[in-house]
A protein has these predicted regions:
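Protruding loop/beta-arch "assembly-hinge" segments enriched in small, turn-prone residues
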Residues: 107-130
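Short helix/loop capping segments that flank catalytic or ligand/cofactor-binding pockets
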Residues: 102-104
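Short, low-complexity, charged/polar segments at coil/turn and helix-coil boundaries
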Residues: 6-7, 11-100
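Non-membrane alpha-helical secondary structure
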Residues: 1, 5-8, 69, 110, ...
């Protein structure tokens, strides 16, 4: 499993004084939405298999999930939203355990690309609080 971590989030959170949890949620939702929507879709299985868990990676796979691109994205995002809402102060793991996800990541860099854009997401979240 490849692990990407967001760096320097604490420096940005200091700017919002008391609104840290809102910034963390907004950034996590935006980045999660980015890589879910960047995941290639043939039958929706890979895009529909994103999961969010607190403090440990998810281990489940929904092999039979099939849906349109937008249905698959909504399916994954709805599963991730609850954990993201409770993530402040905890480790948040967004995982996809479908066996070919690393191959898709090597082709498209959907997670890596979203993580590289995290500064933009943090800036937007901080601006949204003012």
């Amino acid at each position: 499993m490849t692990i990407y971590q967001l760096r320097n989030l604490d420096k940005w959170v200091q700017k919002v004084k008391g609104e840290e949890d809102k910034v963390v949620r907004a950034v996590a939702l935006q980045i999660t939405n980015e890589f879910i929507n960047r995941t290639r879709v043939r039958y929706g299985t890979a895009r529909g298999n994103w999961h969010a868990e607190l403090n440990a990676p998810a281990v489940n796979i929904e092999r039979d999930y099939v849906g349109t691109p937008s249905e698959a994205a909504q399916h994954s995002l709805s599963k991730c939203t609850k954990a993201i809402a409770e993530a402040y102060g905890k480790r948040l793991f967004i995982t996809n355990n479908i066996e070919y996800i690393e191959h898709l990541e090597s082709l498209d860099s959907m997670v890596r690309g979203a993580v590289l854009e995290f500064n933009r997401a943090i800036d937007a979240a901080v601006k949204g609080l003012k």
